[in-house]
């Protein structure tokens, strides 16, 4: 894994953690870790974490 891909992976896992533990919606979590665009963050979540943000949140 390249350094850039690893950095993206860390950022996306922080988005996931904030959604699960802090009960942030995907937009708030994405902006909190530095994403500036909702479509880009959703696309990265889908590509790197292999799930849509709706699938991350419980119930």
From Swiss-Prot:
Protein's UniProt keywords contain Oxidoreductase: no
Keywords: DNA-binding, Transcription, Transcription regulation
Signal peptide positions on this chain: none
Domain HTH araC/xylS-type: 1-59
Regions recorded as binding DNA: 26-49
Molecular-function GO terms, alphabetical: DNA-binding transcription factor activity; sequence-specific DNA binding
Top-level taxonomic group: Bacteria
InterPro entries on file: HTH_AraC
Transcription regulation among keywords: yes
The protein's name in its UniProt record: Putative HTH-type transcriptional regulator YneL
């Amino acid at each position: 894994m390249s350094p850039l891909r690893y950095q993206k992976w860390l950022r996306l896992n922080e988005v996931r953690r904030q959604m699960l533990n802090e009960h942030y919606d995907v937009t708030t979590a994405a902006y909190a870790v530095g994403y500036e665009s909702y479509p880009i963050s959703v696309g990265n979540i889908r590509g790197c974490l292999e799930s849509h943000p709706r699938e991350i949140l419980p119930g």
